[in-house]
């Protein structure tokens, strides 16, 4: 049963054209997730178009127009099972989607696979650096690096070329804080060293990609942290009373607990808890629950309030410091800009009070202190003041409540995380 194995979200990152989609296609194919007839059909189609080496990549690039252009755009979720884990692959094609999804936590990755091409003239490139730095900044806890396209080195499967690229990867990852990262030679296209050791790489004594994936650590469920449950909705049920609904992000809720909702500042007792219409005595991280609270009226709570223990209330802020990435803004952002911040289930207009500095996406160093404005592509530290009471936590303490998206003009213009705060 898939559901009994721990679940892992895996994000595939790296420079464009270094073989991410081919690797994903290969993994799915090897795990029997793609029927042979589809592979045959793709192969025939690719050959007709003169792209004989694209068969596995085409599994991911399944839209006609993408195939014509040879580009992956859709963010695709694919699943496969190993002996140990149930993986969901978050293919990260469009840089922008990737950053937005990673930051807002819609696809919080438990691990990343960094794909670097071994082909001459490729190796570690601009986007490789940027993706690695973002993975670190956004709290991806573990990383596997793969040196792909080993079949395309001169001569093929060159140990010398592997070592050159391996050194480049180590130089990139060590300063930004990724330690003990396995760096594995393979070929996504030919299938070398994916599931089993390859005679073409007889010099390689380390793990296959599969062994490295199985060696990843299970993401810890944050049960030891204080309870935090962002409210999605509130109902009043005849004969029962007020029933808030939401997903527990951290901690545990038990029947009988004294809880408080912030910023509403309303306290009550948990009388009952239900999940999927089944009563339960306690619920934990990841559980979507409805719970009845005594002592609070329906109209006293709303979406965006956060429930926590009465003796450890969720943090209401007067202002906070954030690291943001500008994803898509038509002009520039200056101090005084007031878009809507989407934090957990809350949506609150916030003013960017001050742009403290911009940051180099390759290594995290300061580019410019107090710039007048920031634009698409910039990473910056900013000071933010919400228009009304807002619960947000430091990403270092409650990552699930510290990430946000910034929306304006009907689109996500930036995303970020709270790195420091001033309590209200």
Swiss-Prot record:
Q: Where is the region G4?
A: 148-151
Chain segments carrying region G5:
187-189
Residue span of region G3 = 91-94
Q: Tell me the InterPro entries matching this sequence.
A: EFTu-like_2, G_TR_CS, GTP-eEF1A_C, P-loop_NTPase, Small_GTP-bd, T_Tr_GTP-bd_dom, TRAFAC_GTPase_members, Transl_B-barrel_sf
Domain of life here? Archaea
One GO location term (cellular component)? cytoplasm
Tell me, what is one Gene Ontology molecular-function annotation carried by this entry? Answer: translation elongation factor activity
Q: Which keywords does the record carry?
A: Cytoplasm, Elongation factor, GTP-binding, Hydrolase, Magnesium, Metal-binding, Nucleotide-binding, Protein biosynthesis
Role noted for this protein: GTP hydrolase that promotes the GTP-dependent binding of aminoacyl-tRNA to the A-site of ribosomes during protein biosynthesis.
Return the similarity comment.
Answer: Belongs to the TRAFAC class translation factor GTPase superfamily. Classic translation factor GTPase family. EF-Tu/EF-1A subfamily.
Q: What is this protein called?
A: Elongation factor 1-alpha
Gene source species: Picrophilus torridus (strain ATCC 700027 / DSM 9790 / JCM 10055 / NBRC 100828 / KAW 2/3)
UniProt gene name: tuf
């Amino acid at each position: 049963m898939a559901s009994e194995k721990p679940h892992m979200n895996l994000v595939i990152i790296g420079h464009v054209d270094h073989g991410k989609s081919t690797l994903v296609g290969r993994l799915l194919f090897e795990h029997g997730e793609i029927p042979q007839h589809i592979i045959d059909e793709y192969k025939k189609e690719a050959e007709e178009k003169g792209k004989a080496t694209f068969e596995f990549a085409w599994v991911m690039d399944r839209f006609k127009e993408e195939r014509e252009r040879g580009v992956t755009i859709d963010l695709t979720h694919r699943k496969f099972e190993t002996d140990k884990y149930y993986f969901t692959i978050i293919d990260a094609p469009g840089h922008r989607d990737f950053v937005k999804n990673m930051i807002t936590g819609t696809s919080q990755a438990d691990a990343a696979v960094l794909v670097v091409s071994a082909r001459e003239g490729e190796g570690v490139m601009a986007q490789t650096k940027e993706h690695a730095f973002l993975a670190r900044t956004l709290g991806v806890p573990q990383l596997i690096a793969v040196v792909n396209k080993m079949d395309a080195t001169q001569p093929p499967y060159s140990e010398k070329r592997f070592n050159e690229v391996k050194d480049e990867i180590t130089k990139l990852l060590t300063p930004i804080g990724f330690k003990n990262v396995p760096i594995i030679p393979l070929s996504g296209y030919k299938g070398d060293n994916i599931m089993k050791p390859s005679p073409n790489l007889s010099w390689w004594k380390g793990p296959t990609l599969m062994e490295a994936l199985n060696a990843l650590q299970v993401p810890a469920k944050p049960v030891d942290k204080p309870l935090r449950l962002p409210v999605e909705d509130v109902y009043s049920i005849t004969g029962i009373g007020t029933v808030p609904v939401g997903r527990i992000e951290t901690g545990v809720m038990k029947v009988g607990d004294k809880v408080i909702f912030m910023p509403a500042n309303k306290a009550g007792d948990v009388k009952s808890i239900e999940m999927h219409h089944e009563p339960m005595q306690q619920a934990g991280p990841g559980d979507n629950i409805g719970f009845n609270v005594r002592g609070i009226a329906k109209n006293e709570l709303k979406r965006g309030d956060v429930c926590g223990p009465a003796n450890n209330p969720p943090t209401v802020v007067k202002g906070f410091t954030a690291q943001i990435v500008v994803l898509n803004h038509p002009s520039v952002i200056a101090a005084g800009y007031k878009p809507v911040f989407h934090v957990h289930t809350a949506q609150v207009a916030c003013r960017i009070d001050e742009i403290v500095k911009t940051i180099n996406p390759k290594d995290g160093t300061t580019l410019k202190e107090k710039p007048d404005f920031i634009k698409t592509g910039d990473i910056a530290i900013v000071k933010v003041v919400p228009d009304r009471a807002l619960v947000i936590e430091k990403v270092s303490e409650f990552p699930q409540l510290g990430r946000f998206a910034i929306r304006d003009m009907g689109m996500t213009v930036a995303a970020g995380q709270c790195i420091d705060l001033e309590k209200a």
